[in-house]
Regions:
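Basic, flexible Lys/Arg- and Gly-enriched helix-loop patches that mediate nucleic-acid binding at interfaces
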Residues: 1-218
Length: 218
């Protein structure tokens, strides 16, 4: 989708492994900007994928759109196909889905996990996350004793990677752009509502300790 009057671009790029998600790199590594160099505008990535990961990466020159989609309160879901080794057992998968404490002391939110392939030596999973911490999935897996050998993002909100080939991109449809905006707005509204409810609960007066209700229960 390209908004002609302001020349705003909204792209879905298949980031290959080996590319960094920055505008430039002082170490001389390949950047995703090389893959969209034919676009006559200064684009920037919406979010990130680390160098060894691949898959869907949104690109735009619309700052408000990028901020809305990447803001933590938006909570837009992202679908990843993750291959780990050795084989993941049930307890490890349960820990990952319930949330784990990372090396910096922060705890990840619960996430949905669907096992695609389970065989000796490796497991392939689909993981749906709403967070975007740096190298989050790799760090989550390391915490439970698993090594990520391949990580591919297949979807972000309503946008699917589909049949894109590594290193190529397509324009988002207007429906996809609007769908991402709507999902981000809904997430922000839910976050605000939860915060207000929490504050209301804190302000609610409590009865004397040991006071009994009408049914005699404390």
């Amino acid at each position: 989708y390209i908004q002609k009057d302001q020349q705003l671009y909204y792209l879905a790029l298949y980031k290959p492994r080996g590319y960094v998600t920055t505008a430039s790199d002082e170490l001389g590594r390949k950047t995703v900007m090389e893959l969209v160099s034919d676009i006559p505008a200064r684009l920037y990535p919406v979010g990130r994928l680390d160098k060894d990961s691949e898959g869907l990466l949104l690109m735009t020159n619309d700052g408000a759109f990028a901020q809305a989609v990447t803001h933590p309160s938006g909570g837009i879901s992202k679908l990843y196909r993750v291959t780990v080794q050795p084989r993941a057992d049930e307890s490890q998968i349960l820990k990952l889905s319930s949330g784990v404490v990372l090396d910096d002391g922060t705890k990840t939110m619960p996430c949905a996990i669907n096992v695609v392939t389970d065989e000796p030596g490796r497991t392939v999973m689909e993981m749906t996350l709403k967070e975007g911490k740096n190298r989050e999935i790799r760090r989550m897996c390391e915490t439970v004793g698993l090594e990520v050998v391949r990580l591919k993002r297949n979807a972000e909100g309503v946008v699917k990677l589909g049949m894109l080939k590594p290193g190529t991109y397509r324009e988002l449809t207007k429906a996809e752009v609007n769908g991402l905006r709507a999902a981000a707005a809904k997430g922000r509204a839910q976050t605000r509502s939860a915060a207000l409810q929490s504050k209301a609960a804190e302000r609610r007066p409590r009865g004397p300790v040991g006071q009994k209700g009408r049914d005699g229960a404390p």
